[in-house]
Structure formats: structure tokens, C-alpha cells
Swiss-Prot record:
The lineage of its organism: Bacteria, Pseudomonadati, Pseudomonadota, Alphaproteobacteria, Hyphomicrobiales. NCBIfam families: infC. Belongs to the IF-3 family. It is found in: Cytoplasm. InterPro entries: T_IF-3_C_sf, T_IF-3_N_sf, Translation_initiation_fac3_CS, Translation_initiation_fac_3, Translation_initiation_fac_3_C, Translation_initiation_fac_3_N. GO terms for cellular component: cytosol; membrane. This is Translation initiation factor IF-3. HAMAP family: IF_3 (MF_00080).
């Protein structure tokens, strides 16, 4: 039984290409048409470059004459640039109480605005203690006021709902 060669990441190069004919693009970007694989390999060796399979799923597969080391480096660079540009959306939490004072409320609003500017979602948790549970309407009104105050910069993702002793609302930036 023959050992199975491990699957290699990336495109096939030079002798790894096992097709009789390929669509060839030379090092200048000129389309040479359908060429026998031996001729394509000879052209690549004469140029001192590699024959790289660019599009294996087309018929015939598209191969290009280029410097494979440089090609790999540029692909890695593109991938790392794409990873840098991605931002992971976090869910930040703001905790309130039904009897919150106006200044405390304004401070919480400022930090919420900062979270929205950074592109994060905000989970607003309104916690009820003891007899405050009897006055859930106060908490609901507070969350409605908060919703109106951030309407310009955020939208409601999850409406206020009661879970045990706390009311939760999730907001996301516009």
C-alpha cells in the first residue's frame, strides 16, 4: 500500500500540477492560451520562476508563471491586513438602579456613548432590590427614557424584559 501524501496548504506548484493541459498566464500577465503542462513548466524554468496553479476548479485549470515565495508572502500580508481591520464586537454592560440620580445617569450615558462610538453593543441591566420589585413601572419608564436619549446613536436590539430581579435591554450602535 502506498503512503498518502499529506494535503498541502495553498496552490499546487511546478511538478505538483498533475494535469495534461493548462490555461497559461506568463510572468508579464499575458494570456498564452491552453498549453501542455511540460511546455508551461519549461517556460517557467527558463524564466527562473515557478508555475503556480491559480484557479484549479476551472477547465482547463489556470496556471501563472511567478515567483512562488513572493506570491505566498503577499497572500500572508493580505490575510494579516484583513485580520487587523476586523473588529470584534463586544457587549459592554451598564448597570442601573431604579432610583438613579440625574448626575449618575448622565455619567452612565457618556460611557454608553463612548461604547457606541467604539462600535460595541451595550447591555443595560436595571437591578431591583427588595420592595423595588413592587414598582417595576419606575424601572420600565427609566429604560424608555434611556431608549429615547440614545435613539440618535443606537437602536434597540432587545426590548426591555424582566429576568428575575432585573430588567435587561440590549442596544447596538447605528
Amino acid at each position: 500500500m502506498r503512503p498518502v501524501a499529506p494535503e498541502k496548504d495553498g496552490p499546487r506548484v511546478n511538478e505538483e500540477i498533475r494535469i495534461r493541459e493548462v490555461q497559461l498566464i506568463d510572468q508579464d500577465g499575458q494570456n498564452r492560451g491552453v498549453v501542455a503542462i511540460r511546455d508551461a513548466l519549461t517556460l517557467a524554468q527558463e524564466a527562473g520562476l515557478d508555475l503556480v496553479e491559480i484557479s484549479p476548479n476551472s477547465a482547463p485549470p489556470v496556471c501563472k508563471i511567478l515567483d512562488y515565495g513572493r506570491f505566498k508572502y503577499q497572500n500572508q500580508k493580505k490575510a494579516s491586513e484583513a485580520r487587523k481591520k476586523q473588529k470584534v464586537v463586544e457587549v459592554k454592560e451598564i448597570k442601573l438602579r431604579p432610583g438613579i440620580d440625574t448626575h449618575d445617569y448622565e455619567v452612565k450615558m457618556r460611557s454608553m456613548e463612548r461604547f457606541f462610538e467604539e462600535g460595541d453593543k451595550v447591555k443595560v441591566t436595571l437591578r431591583f432590590r427588595g420592595r423595588e420589585m413592587a414598582h417595576q413601572d419606575i424601572g420600565f419608564k427609566l429604560l424608555q427614557k434611556l431608549k429615547e436619549d440614545v435613539a440618535a446613536i443606537a437602536k434597540v436590539e432587545a426590548e426591555p424584559m424582566l429576568e428575575g430581579r432585573q430588567m435587561i435591554m440590549i442596544l447596538s450602535p447605528r
